[in-house]
C-alpha cells in the first residue's frame, strides 16, 4: 500500500535510486496504490550521469510492496521493500534492466515490458 509521501526504491537502471510518491493516479480521491498501479513520483536521490536527475517529476509503476498481496487461490506474497519502475508517457520503462523479483500481478495490469525485463516473476 503506497500513499502520498511514501519513499520507494527504484528497481531499474534509469539512474534514480530513491523516489517519493506525490500522487496516486486513478480517481480524484484515490488514496492507496498497490502492485501494478501508476503513481507520480519525485526523484529524491539519483546517481551521476543517469537518465534522470534529482527533483524531476515522473510517473512510475509500483512493482513491490511490503504490504501483503492476496492471490485468488488464497496464497499471500509480500516483499521486503517498496519498489517502483520509472515509466514514460507511453507506459514504457525508462531503464533497460529491472532488478529484483516482480509479481505476476503486473501481467494482469498490462505491464508486459516490465515482466519481460525482470529476472524473476513470482
UniProtKB/Swiss-Prot annotation:
Function: Binds to 23S rRNA. Forms part of two intersubunit bridges in the 70S ribosome.
SUPFAM superfamilies named in the record: Ribosomal protein L14 (SSF50193)
Name this protein carries in UniProt: Large ribosomal subunit protein uL14
Keywords: Ribonucleoprotein, Ribosomal protein, RNA-binding, rRNA-binding
Gene: rplN
The keyword Glycosyltransferase is assigned to this record: no
Family statement drawn from the similarity comment of this UniProt entry: Belongs to the universal ribosomal protein uL14 family.
Matching InterPro entries: Ribosomal_uL14 (IPR000218), Ribosomal_uL14_bac-type (IPR005745), Ribosomal_uL14_CS (IPR019972), Ribosomal_uL14_sf (IPR036853)
